[in-house]
Each structure stands twice: as structure tokens, then as C-alpha cells.
Swiss-Prot record:
<keyword id="KW-0808">Transferase</keyword>
<dbReference type="Pfam" id="PF04101">
    <property type="entry name" value="Glyco_tran_28_C"/>
</dbReference>
<dbReference type="GO" id="GO:0051991">
    <property type="term" value="F:UDP-N-acetyl-D-glucosamine:N-acetylmuramoyl-L-alanyl-D-glutamyl-meso-2,6-diaminopimelyl-D-alanyl-D-alanine-diphosphoundecaprenol 4-beta-N-acetylglucosaminlytransferase activity"/>
</dbReference>
<feature type="binding site">
    <location>
        <position position="167"/>
    </location>
    <ligand>
        <name>UDP-N-acetyl-alpha-D-glucosamine</name>
    </ligand>
</feature>
<dbReference type="GO" id="GO:0008360">
    <property type="term" value="P:regulation of cell shape"/>
</dbReference>
<feature type="binding site">
    <location>
        <position position="128"/>
    </location>
    <ligand>
        <name>UDP-N-acetyl-alpha-D-glucosamine</name>
    </ligand>
</feature>
<dbReference type="InterPro" id="IPR007235">
    <property type="entry name" value="Glyco_trans_28_C"/>
</dbReference>
<keyword id="KW-0328">Glycosyltransferase</keyword>
<dbReference type="InterPro" id="IPR004276">
    <property type="entry name" value="GlycoTrans_28_N"/>
</dbReference>
<feature type="binding site">
    <location>
        <position position="195"/>
    </location>
    <ligand>
        <name>UDP-N-acetyl-alpha-D-glucosamine</name>
    </ligand>
</feature>
<keyword id="KW-0132">Cell division</keyword>
<keyword id="KW-0573">Peptidoglycan synthesis</keyword>
<dbReference type="GO" id="GO:0071555">
    <property type="term" value="P:cell wall organization"/>
</dbReference>
<comment type="pathway">
    <text>Cell wall biogenesis; peptidoglycan biosynthesis.</text>
</comment>
<dbReference type="GO" id="GO:0050511">
    <property type="term" value="F:undecaprenyldiphospho-muramoylpentapeptide beta-N-acetylglucosaminyltransferase activity"/>
</dbReference>
<keyword id="KW-0472">Membrane</keyword>
<keyword id="KW-1003">Cell membrane</keyword>
Amino acid sequence: MTDSPRRRFLMMAGGTGGHVFPALATARALQQRGHEVHWLGASGGMEERLIGDTDIPLSLIHISGLRGKGKLALLLAPFRLMRALGEAYTHLRRIRPDCVVGMGGFVTGPGGIAAWLMRKPLVIHEQNAIAGMTNRWLTRFSETVLEAFPGSFGDQTVTRCTGNPVRGEVASMDEPEQRLAGRSGKLRVLVVGGSLGAQVFNQQLPQALALMPEADRPDVRHQCGEKNLEAAQAAYEEAGVNASVEPFIRDMAEAYGWADLVICRAGALTVSELCAAGIGAILVPFPHAVDDHQTRNGQHMVKAGAAILVPQPRLTPEVLAETLKDLATDRKRILTMAKAARSLARPDATERVVNYCLEAANG
């Protein structure tokens, strides 16, 4: 499908897969409709590698977070922000987009202000159940404010609830009844710590599996994060447990299709992909997430019966082993959780975000 006239969009997203992948899904959908897409990211961020490997032109600015960086970083922050704003403004003048789309990460702050200074329509999208500080601040400069979960900005901001764009190959997966039909034997458990890994899973899951009788242990595929590969492999070896340990999984649709159950954080992208794929989960929210937004994200699935939520302070090898043991012998519950997850899916999320972007670009 091609929309007319052809428009030029600048995507802004970076820092984590939770920002990059929804933005990439949106970018691909815009390209499929015949539009031109550019990307603004932060130098040194994961977007530099992920988008650098695509056909999308990538521009970078120098920007990073301020939390926990000390007094010197706070003193230098205004100067660094001004430099980042200048870099963003220069890129926007060169690219001349018809619409700027902010999907999260530090880059969206200076990029959003640069768009406002150049009178370019700004669309922002909040992936989490509680809006982040940068997006809250940018609402006053935005043409359109989109959110994945209702009420993430509170009652004072006019928003459009779209759901989270997910990768097309995940959104098009078979229904749980088809995917899980006829499965028997050991439970297949996919462990995902997010694009950066989760040390608590790397440490505790091998110990939990060691507590289970070998006949009851699930088959495990574990994404541990690139920096944690050797430590995670050593933890499994020390526990005397076999598992397939990978630093990063690029084909998540294939991984979800293999799994009966997922153990993971409750990041916005993860929750949205679990729902799109139709797969139940044991959720362990990141305890230091700003405003505890991961717990709010996870409650979306828990209330529907699609997930079990375990706060990290309560997560022990014993608790994890007992939970897995209960699920390993109850495939009926596994299917029920998967169907509940699929009922929460927003398969039209990408299309809705794209349509709002086109509306802004066309004025």
C-alpha cells in the first residue's frame, strides 16, 4: 500500500530494545507504504549497531542519562544538553523531515526540542504503563501523544491509545491452540533478560533447576546478554544443569514459537510481544525501573490470567523451582495462560501509530 504524497520521517529512539524495536516496526511499516525514513540515535547506544545494520540512514548525537552520574555530571549537564540540541538541530536541518517521531530514549529530548524549534510536527509514543520524564516534558511540544497503555500520562494530557508496535513476524504468529497443539514431554522455557540481559536470571535459574528432579527439569533456552555469556555458562556448569545459553536472540518470533513459557522482565516491549505471540510468562519486574513502571506493565497480563508476577526481592531458587514444577505438569494451564495473553494483543498497533504519524505529516 502506498500513501500519497510521499513523506519523510525521522524516527528517534535508542538505549534499549524496548524503544528501538517498536520504532523499527513503525519505520518498516512506513517504508512499506512508500515513505522515506531516517533515524536519530545516541552515539554508543545499541541503536548505533542495530540500525547501522539496516538500510535506514542513521544520524547520531552525543547524549546520555544523568541518573547516578554524580555532581560533576549534573554541573556539566546543561552544556552537554546544549551540545546535543545543537547536533540534533543540525541533523534536522539537513534531513528536513515532514514529521519527527519520538519513541523513547535520551535522544528524544534534544531531538524533540529541535523539532519544535524548526516547527516540525512531533509525535511521541510512550511504551510503558507509566510515562517517562522525557515524554511527559515533551507533551507540551507535541502534535500528537500516543500511549501503549491507557492512562500512562494521567488525566491532564490528551492521548491516543494505540498499543505497542511489535515486529511483524511476532504479530503474525499462529494462535496458541495451533502452536501448542500436541506438545508433550518436557516444558520448553525461554528465559529473556531483555536486550541487555538480567543478572538475577543468570544467577538464580541454574540454581532453581538444580533443585528440581532431572526428569522434571524443563528444556531451557536462555538469553543472558552479551556481557554475561561466560558467567551464565559457568553458572549452569557449576549447577550441573544443561541449557542453551545465547548472548542475544535476533529472531524472537522463532524463539517464542519454540517456547511453552517465558521467564522475563516486564518491559513494555516484552509484555506487548508476549501478548502478540500468545504465550504465558513468569514476570520478574526490574526493581529499579523508574516509578516501578515494569510492575504496572506486568499487572496488565496478571489481571488477565496470562502471567505470574514475582517481585525480585521475593525471587529465590526455591520459589522459582516450585513455580516451574507446578507449571511443568499442567499443560492445560500453559495453554490457558497463552490464550489469555493473546486476548490482550493489539495486532493493529503498528498500523495505528503509522496512521497518526501520517496525519501529523500531512498537517
